[in-house]
């Protein structure tokens, strides 16, 4: 230790400043990324138990009167929001007509989807937010619809109307029994074939 310098600075070696951390180029898989060699079309998705599994995302539209599946698809994209337009087009193709109204859960809400349905003159009942079972029920809106409402706020308002509540409440009575029938009675809880093609 040099007598002319304080002890802490005398023992600290000088370091060069380092540059920014190296970044991997876009599209580079993470170090722990894995690939499924038996079914490369499938993707890792979160299931209803919040566990991550190798899976596909099954889509279905059910007719409200007959409780028959009128459109179905299997995708490897976890998010539901991008599938709504293709599913509606499939209904139109299968039935040779368009539906009058459509109810879906919050996973399908986007301004793009609502606009798509409005252009086709299909009444949409899709909550922009996940519905909480314990949420207090707000009174139905009164008066004219304010012109400056966002798409989300217009949909929230529509779902608070008497017709909106009634229509959206039927969604579970229409769709869930069909899924229950497929899973429980027919025993279809998983797909036994590999790849989207099959």
Predicted features and spans:
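Anion-binding and metal-coordination hotspots
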Residues: 1-198
């Amino acid at each position: 230790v040099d007598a002319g310098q304080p002890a802490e600075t005398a023992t600290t070696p000088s370091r060069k400043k380092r540059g920014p951390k190296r970044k991997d180029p876009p599209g580079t898989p993470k170090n722990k990324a894995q690939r499924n060699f038996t079914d490369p079309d499938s993707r890792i998705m979160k299931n209803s138990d919040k566990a991550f599994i190798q899976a596909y995302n099954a889509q279905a539209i059910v007719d409200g009167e007959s409780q028959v599946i009128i459109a179905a698809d299997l995708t490897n994209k976890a998010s539901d929001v991008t599938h709504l337009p293709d599913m509606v087009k499939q209904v139109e193709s299968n039935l040779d007509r368009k539906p009058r109204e459509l109810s879906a859960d919050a996973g399908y809400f986007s301004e793009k989807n609502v606009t798509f349905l409005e252009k086709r003159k299909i009444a949409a009942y899709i909550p922009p937010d996940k519905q909480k079972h314990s949420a207090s029920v707000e009174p139905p809106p009164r008066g004219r619809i304010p012109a400056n409402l966002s798409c989300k706020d217009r949909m929230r308002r529509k779902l608070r109307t008497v017709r909106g509540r009634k229509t959206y409440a039927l969604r579970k009575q229409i769709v869930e029994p069909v899924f229950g029938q497929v899973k429980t009675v027919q025993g279809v809880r998983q797909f036994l074939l590999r790849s989207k093609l099959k």
